Amino acid sequence: MNEQIIMLGTGSAMVTECYNTCFLLKSKNDYLLVDAGGGNGILSVIKKSGVDWNSIKTMFITHSHTDHILGAVWVIRQISALMNSGKYDGNFNIYCHDECVDSITAICNHTLAPKFLKNINTKIFINEVKDGEKQNAGSIRLTFFDIF
């Protein structure tokens, strides 16, 4: 079976017994991370999933609520650290709407060390998407749409 969904979290904003809603979509050897939850718990749930960080090349953030976006900073930090140590191949793309781009960029700029920030816009790309836009996430074809 080539396609799979790996649930990393199923909880809402104020969970204490599980992680916030986020998941990995697998197609062939590509993984797409959808949302990142509310903090550094994303690191342990990905570790528990057994998925190699090097196989996650794309992340999609649905909206900028804290329980969906704050884990993104930890994902960026982890992938940047792997890039810096030569353990991550290629680029990492994040897709989200304009408000998320601004939020992720601001949080990263205020919290991450320069050694992690240096990969943003060179190897880690935070891409704004518009309603109806299409992108490839490895072998997964995405069509973005606005529900508001």
Residue ranges and their predicted role:
Residues N40-Y95:
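Active-site metal-binding motif and surrounding structural segment of the metallo-beta-lactamase
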Residues M1-S49:
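Conserved beta-strand hairpin/beta-sheet module of binuclear metal-dependent hydrolase folds
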Residues T10-A13, A81-L82, I147:
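Short beta-turn/strand-loop junction motif enriched in small, turn-promoting residues
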Residues Y19, A72-V73, I107:
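Conserved strand-to-helix beginnings and helix N-cap segments that scaffold or border functional pockets
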Residues G90-F148:
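Metallo-beta-lactamase
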Residues G38-G39, H65, C100, D131:
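A generic "binding-loop/recognition-motif" signal
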Residues S27-D30, S80, E99:
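Short loop segments at secondary-structure junctions
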Residues V15, L24, G50, N84-G86, ...:
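Short secondary-structure boundary/capping segments
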